[in-house]
Amino acid sequence: MMLVKKAGITMMVHAENADMIAVLQKYYLDRGKTDPVYHYYSRPPVAEDEATSRAIYLAKMADCPLFVVHVSTKRAMEAIRDAHIAGQVVFGETCTHYLTLTTDCLAKPGFEGAKYVCSPPLCSQLH
């Protein structure tokens, strides 16, 4: 991020904790849990929340402008908002499917559920 700041550009990140996801993916795969809904279970909202907060802290340390893409959770959005209000140059964007669809779509039978696999995954309405 320091090099990005030095170059005068904005860092763009897709924020998900890859280590957390790798552990959960292995856990579900080892148990034969491969239905589309397990894409959500292996990438829980906390994976995005933690990675978004970490990116914000690192950007603050580097004094680097930050743009978080594909924001899908309330906590990630709140972290971006709070940092922005505090004066940090940080922005986020989301996609229509995160505002209109939920994990219920992933639970559809057969290939139908696979049509809704995206990353970060669709969340429940609570997130």
Question: Can you say where each PLM-predicted feature lies in the sequence?
Answer:
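Histidine/acidic residue-rich metal-binding segments in metalloenzymes
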Residues: 1-127
